[in-house]
A protein has these predicted regions:
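Transmembrane helical cores of multi-pass secondary ion antiporters/exchangers
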Residues: 1-200
Length: 200
């Protein structure tokens, strides 16, 4: 629906809100013909669907960026991801633990979910299409940071899962989380991203 961005730019509401409302209405009208939206009833399908949505949204943010990577060009984005986002995760987790009486696992999950910027909902203040030189540093920083921080937040989601598993006595450890979910997956994500970026 190519007319949707033009409409939402006039009324000041993200088109994601309209798609969400459309999904609610469609399920309300045709619920007997559609699968259950409850995650526990369709775990595998919902897992892969949410992964696909994250990949598409991050790809959409990535293809808008035409500034070559360097520490100088990306310094603000990297500071937002590696400093500001980590502080937001810690702050949200601390508030959840001390003020909402959540467990450590639930508090960490709250921080990991709330801290990242959504690349879809933030699109109204992001960069215009590639090769247009009018974008400000602020708009570039918001776009690049929105793409980077989702990937950097995933290890903390797994940290919350690890704490929950440890509380239930399951066979896992913080060392495994750090070596696999934090070090290995981040490095492989960067390597695959560089290779695909060069190839395409």
């Amino acid at each position: 629906m190519v007319w949707m961005p033009a409409l939402t730019s006039k009324i000041g509401i993200s088109y994601s809100v309209f798609y969400l409302l459309a999904g609610i209405i469609l399920y309300w009208l045709f619920s007997e013909y559609l699968p259950s939206p409850l995650p526990k009833e369709n775990e595998s399908a919902i897992l892969h669907l949410t992964e696909l949505i994250v990949i598409i949204s991050l790809m959409g943010a990535g293809i808008k960026i035409d500034k070559s990577f360097s520490l100088k060009n990306w310094s603000l984005s990297l500071r937002l991801v590696f400093i500001a986002m980590f502080l937001c995760i810690i702050a949200a987790a601390a508030m959840g633990y001390f003020f909402l009486d959540l467990t450590i696992a639930s508090a960490l999950l709250l921080g990991a979910v709330l801290a990242p910027t959504d690349p879809v909902l933030a699109s109204d203040v992001q960069v215009s299409p590639p090769n247009e030189k009018s974008d400000s540093e602020t708009r570039f920083t918001l776009t690049s940071e929105a793409g980077l921080n989702d990937g950097m937040a995933f290890p903390f989601t797994w940290l919350a899962i690890t704490f929950a598993a440890l509380a239930e006595g399951k066979d896992t450890s913080l060392l495994y989380w750090f070596s696999y979910h934090f070090v290995y997956q981040i490095i492989m994500g960067v390597v695959v991203g560089i290779i695909l970026g060069k190839v395409t």
